[in-house]
UniProtKB/Swiss-Prot annotation:
This is Phosphoglycerol transferase I. One of its GO terms (cellular component) is plasma membrane. Its EC number is 2.7.8.20. Keywords: Cell inner membrane, Cell membrane, Membrane, Transferase, Transmembrane, Transmembrane helix. GO terms for molecular function: phosphatidylglycerol-membrane-oligosaccharide glycerophosphotransferase activity. It comes from the Bacteria. Pathway: Glycan metabolism; osmoregulated periplasmic glucan (OPG) biosynthesis. CDD domains: LTA_synthase. Transfers a phosphoglycerol residue from phosphatidylglycerol to the membrane-bound nascent glucan backbones. It comes from Salmonella typhi.
Amino acid sequence: MSELLSVALFLASVLIYAWKAGRNTWWFAATLTVLGLFVILNITLYASDYFTGDGINDAVLYTLTNSLTGAGVGKYILPGIGIALALVAVFGALGWVLRRRRHHPHHVGYSLLALLLALGSVDASPAFRQITELVKSQMRDGDPDFAVYYKEPAKTIPHPKLNLVYIYGESLERTYFDNDAFPNLTPELGALKNEGLDFSHTMQLPGTDYTIAGMVASQCGIPLFAPFEGNASASVSSFFPQNICLGDILKNSGYQNYFVQGANLRFAGKDVFLKSHGFDHLYGAEELKTVVADPSYRNDWGFYDDTVLDEAWKKFEALSRSGQRFSLFTLTVDTHHPDGFISRTCNRKRYDYDGKPNQSFSTVSCSQENIAEFINKIKASPWFKDTVIVVSSDHLAMNNTAWKYLNKQDRNNLFFILRGDKPQQETLAVKRNTMDNGATVLDILGGDNFIGLGRSSLSGQSLSEVFLNVKEKVLAMKPDIIRLWNFPKEIKDFTVDRDKNMIAFSGSHFRLPLLLRVSDKRVEPLPESEYSAPLRFQLADFAPRDNFVWIDRCYKMAQLWAPALALSTDWCVSQGQLGGQQTVQHVDKAQWQGKTAFKDTMIDMERYKGNVDTLKIVDNDIRYKADSFIFNVAGAPEEVKQFSGISRPESWGRWSNAQLGDEVKIEYKAPLPKKFDLVITAKAFGDNANRPIPVRVGNEEQTLVLGHDVSTITLHFNNPTDANTLVIAPPAPVSTNEGNILGHSPRKLGIGMVEIKVVNVES
């Protein structure tokens, strides 16, 4: 209703101004601005829905002030371009329509009416309401009901008897199991769901709507609200350190807690969260690659579900045989948006909807088959009688190729339980949410029936039942939940641990790199993560007077304030204000002690603009003074005009990447010498090793042979044609996720370059 009203008010404003208001520059500008705001808000809502499937939420609010560089972002480039073009077109058309009768005499009354209608359209729009509620949630001091409903459980289970297997299905919401809407999509896992305790109304609340947030909610009974963006949690050293979560209780009760997934454990800080709360045995992409049958069988995120669940079964079997009390948590990944991945061992590789194949539905059908096979192995084992199996989605599906069909249904998260000790078959329609999952499991295991804000759905009352406006209530509690981090409010002295890549201050520890915004009563950490912009881009968003402390590799800040460190990959500390004074200090000790020293200086807006512009220079456009191309830092020597076919800097150098260009091309500003030596320090990847690699300058070609280890080779070139471009053509680029950013499409690697130097040998 609100949406229709806002559109009606918008159209009425346009029509009244265009046909009745007449010509007046001020009224035209004011009306166009407000109507344009309406358009921007609704395009923002549409774009946010595309990424999150949940409108404008906390993640979007963060992204509005930070660049999105995360997993699979390349698949969203075309929609993003489309939205930008649509915005330009709509603004142009809107301006043209409003000025249709610009020669008509100006009428103040109609102009005022049009402006008021435009303001009303903005106020009535769902986008404005969502943003307003989010902004309010940032400004609130908390909610008195938090202290009433937040409860800490006992730290142990009195007489534990059952082992626990907890399966998180990535985005595997209960909606997929509606056989009327999606016939025969989930037959195997759906049949198992119908054998157990099936909770049919598990809603999604703010702060529980992405993987790490869903895990925190289900184990700690609280949403993931933090003094930083949730997926940046990898930078913290402890996770809700004061909370008692399900893993803590299990460990205190004698359980050995295991977690197995196919992706890297560091992503979004899952390793930090789990280690902080009772898990001593963690297996992710790095840990599994030495034990799985086929280490090369991977998707963009890590190992496929069939591989992960095979390893989980091996763990279950070994732990059961040992007689040790245990919990085994596992997380799938094949159903990750936007398209998902299909394991090669499943039979259900294709699912058609509306008469054509649908990739997201296909991955769901495949993944549920893999999960069901894993569960059936447990059920067929002699240890099932001592086991509780839990299957839940981590969150609702985000925008994927099935999303528009899901949205036509009543959407809920998946949560069902299979008890080997006491089979129960029942569908419970009680209103609940993800925070109730851990408390329900704890209740079954013999512990308390509450964790945090979560309540057992078997013997307690969920906040979803208590409050009709539970989403607004949870947002109101956001400041209370953030306070649970016990995060410091000031920084004076700090220590940088060069060997552990950590910074410590006021009792808190963070992984490096890190950017801090410092005010009188608040220290805001801005870590670097897969979903956030590089820290220099985040710093560029600071106001001229904002105090900052920036700990990063020296070369990243050297181009601004310390040219002598332009090639250093050591840690440096910079602090100051972008519009005032800045300092850069080299971390030259294993335990480096620092102090904050913000000077109250005059703000120079020219300096501020220059700093911001320099911070925003993209990596490939950075230039430094050097007599060679050093590949483990961003940019290139001043003599280089441009380059292509080269991946991002890593700690050792850079790979060639045929996804960015079939050949490595380095174009210099001036012709290369008539006669020169080309000194190349590099290594080869995969089948490129021990094969001739063509290297060309003008009409002359030499060959380079590299092994898998780094070596230095000198090639001799004559350049009679004054060519200025060096070309290296790896013969067999290999598509791989080796060293890739989590969730990104595979790179096609050829050679790994450490340094290239041109030595003039003209006599």
